[in-house]
Amino acid sequence: MADDKVKTGAEMWDQRFSSEEYAYGKEANVWLSERVSQINPPPNNRALFPADGEGRNAVWAATIGWNSEVFDLSIVGKQKCHLLAQEHAVSVDYDVDDLALREFPQRSYDLIACSWFHTPSEIRKVHMPRMLHSLKSGGHFVMEGYHTSQMPLQSGGPKSLDLLFDLDEVLGELTGEKAPQMHIIHIAVTSTVLDESELHKGQAMVVRIHLQRD
């Protein structure tokens, strides 16, 4: 059953990314890029961009010195990520993989950054904390996602409360007993105006989290 769900998700995202246009544009997520720009890429660094779709965040990060890696469900997303990387004369490693099935190397990444990584809560509660164990000591986790109050708004995001983020709930998961020891650099629920193609456009309610592993 889990494999069937992955296949269905992959087919959906392959269709979403099938146009020559980039579904969410070619520019990195604004808030993610602002936070990551404040972190100096260490020598021989590794940066992971989960669910980065067509690779806009990972490609941007590669242009400022990060060794970017992506995993996502879509083979079409992988192909478009590599095209975007070629445009910017950088390289990005991209695995077609699923959060719940992926094996994460321990203490390997200096940065994990994601935008709009919405998964069912039963998967998120187990596997997002598990992913954090792949951060090195001092490594950063940066994310932006739609808040539960996004439901009535028409600026993007899933129309399921289970897929949206409640700040207290997700923060409890990311800093709880299943996660490594993390400390909070920034957390917020805020209103913002999105302009990431027609799919993410207009006034939106978002959760923003920046953590660092002890």
Predicted regions and their residues:
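Conserved class I S-adenosyl-L-methionine
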Residues: 1-42
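Class I SAM-dependent methyltransferase SAM/SAH-binding core
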Residues: 46-48, 54-101
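A short acidic, Gly/Pro-enriched loop at the edge of an enzyme's catalytic core
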Residues: 100-111
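Short "lid" loop at the C-terminus of a central beta-strand within the Rossmann-like core
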Residues: 118-119, 145-153, 192
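A short, conserved alpha-helix within the catalytic core of class I
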Residues: 119-131
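Conserved beta-strand signature within the Rossmann-like core of class I S-adenosyl-L-methionine
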Residues: 138-146
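Short alpha-helix
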Residues: 162-181, 185-187
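Core SAM-dependent methyltransferase catalytic element
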Residues: 194-214
